[in-house]
Design a protein with these regions (language model features):
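Substrate-access "cap/lid" subdomains that shape
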Residues: 156-217
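Catalytic NTP-binding/metal-coordinating core of nucleotidyl cyclase/transferase enzymes
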Residues: 380-441
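Structured core elements
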Residues: 9, 46, 176, 232-235, ...
Length: 441
């Protein structure tokens, strides 16, 4: 479950901008929001906003002052990275850092929000140890949580430590996000009590800003209960922001991903890739299962699919109850390719066998008998089999005399009519024509 008691999202969504009247949010109004959140008791105020260009209305000093006076605040930075095609193929080089404007950057903390999508999905955040060490810049969620806990983050030997919290990264320095289970019927975190609209901390408080502290707290008692002591993330889920990503649990807004990452670290329950030995054992079992299935004479494809379903169910079980992730896509692709390859091989083998049977026996056996053998080649047993049979022999009585009275053309016509009739009788009983001897069959 999400940590509603520790994390709050303030959302500048569609409804907010409809009432606000313009987009994006003016920096003097961001300053008001920061000041109001601090007065409401927010422990940390993290703005998920890129402010790398100076404000055209000279409002940066106003926001810088609000950030500085509010204490634990932070803004977004972006790492300009030269990344290899695949993260395991080489080192990522830093070509610079896009920070907020100088006056804002000097007034607050920063964290990078670069994301790495794998397979078209965002499921983890990446750490860059050399960049962190040289430039002292951490992933946004890590920096926010470190400020909330009043600790300095550290990364040693692949283990992230935040005070009493510690969690291992994977071999590529990724922290896997444990996306929370939302209440039934809800799609986004913004639909839960973890999120309030920015209307409540900006427009709704306009008439209260000039009140003294005691009166302000009295008038905002309910709102203060939602904000006080929390790590507050301010972000934009409006359609204009395009800040939404595909994840293993569906579409998730960028600010929600930050919140989910913070919650994952607070619970010390990051999703972990299964150990290599464990994964190798499962793959061996899967391989043996496929080998056993390939020996079946019937329903092998159905059993193949059953094995795949069982494997997927095991993956889901370990993911939900133990936080372990197996390499699901590669084995499943391998399974399907194996199934297709085996079926193609068997099809070609069967086709070759059928071609041989038809070629070898088409001159001797009736089509019905050939079809029977093609359907069940095991009927061709060396040594034969004992059964009751009928021997059919027929010829034309006095053929020599008859043939002498006919022209060659008439004789051929007679033989064709006669032998054809005899063959039809034999075929009607699924018989086999052994040979023709003149007028005899």
């Amino acid at each position: 479950d999400f940590l509603y008691d520790d994390i709050l999202i303030v959302d500048t969504e569609e409804e907010f901008f409809e009432e606000y009247g313009s987009w994006p949010l003016k920096r003097k109004d961001i300053a008001k929001m920061v000041t109001n959140l601090k007065r409401l008791g927010a422990e940390v105020i993290a703005l998920d906003m890129i402010m790398d260009f100076p404000n055209g209305y000279g409002e940066d000093p106003i926001l810088a002052e609000a950030l500085q006076e509010s204490g634990k605040t932070m803004v977004v930075s972006l790492l300009n990275l030269d990344t290899p095609i695949w993260y395991s193929l080489g080192e990522t080089r830093l070509n610079g850092i896009t920070d907020a404007t100088e006056i804002l950057n000097e007034s607050t903390e920063r964290g990078y929000t670069n994301v790495t999508e794998i397979g078209g999905q965002l499921s983890r955040i990446r750490f860059y140890p050399e960049i962190i060490k040289e430039h002292n810049i951490w992933p946004y969620a890590v920096q926010a949580l470190a400020m909330y806990l009043d600790v300095e983050p550290s990364l040693e030997d692949g283990v992230l430590t935040l005070g009493d919290l510690s969690m291992p990264l994977d071999e590529y320095n990724f922290l896997w996000i444990d996306f929370p289970k939302l209440p039934g019927g809800l799609t986004f975190l913004k639909q839960t009590p973890a999120v309030i609209t920015a209307l409540e901390v900006l427009m709704d408080l306009e008439d209260l800003e000039d009140l003294d502290e005691e009166e302000f707290l009295e008038e905002t008692e309910d709102l203060r209960e939602m904000v006080e002591g929390k790590l507050v993330l301010v972000g934009d889920t409006s359609e204009m922001s395009h800040d939404i990503f595909e994840t293993p649990v569906g579409e998730v807004y960028g600010i929600e991903i930050i919140a989910d990452t913070v919650a994952t670290m607070m619970k010390q329950q990051p999703i972990r890739p299964a150990p290599f030995a464990f994964e190798a054992l499962v793959m061996l079992i899967l391989l043996l299962a496929f080998f056993a299935v390939s020996q079946l004479k019937k329903f092998e494809n159905l059993v193949f699919l059953l094995v795949i379903v069982v494997y997927s169910a095991i993956n889901i079980y370990f993911y939900i109850y133990h936080g372990l992730v197996f390499s699901l896509s590669y084995p499943l692709v391998a399974c399907f390719l194996s199934m297709i390859t085996i079926n193609l091989y068997l099809f070609m083998l069967e086709r070759k066998q059928k071609t041989f049977i038809r070629g070898a026996f088409s001159q001797y056996l009736s089509p019905a008998v050939i079809d029977m053998i093609v359907k069940d080649p095991d009927k061709l047993k060396l040594g034969g089999e004992r059964r009751e049979m009928t021997a059919f022999f027929s010829d034309i009585q006095g053929f020599s005399t008859v043939s002498e009275s006919l022209t060659p053309e008439e004789l051929v016509q007679l033989l064709n009519e006669y032998l054809t009739s005899m063959c039809e009788i034999i075929s009607s009983y699924n018989g086999t024509v052994d040979k023709f001897e003149g007028d005899a069959i």
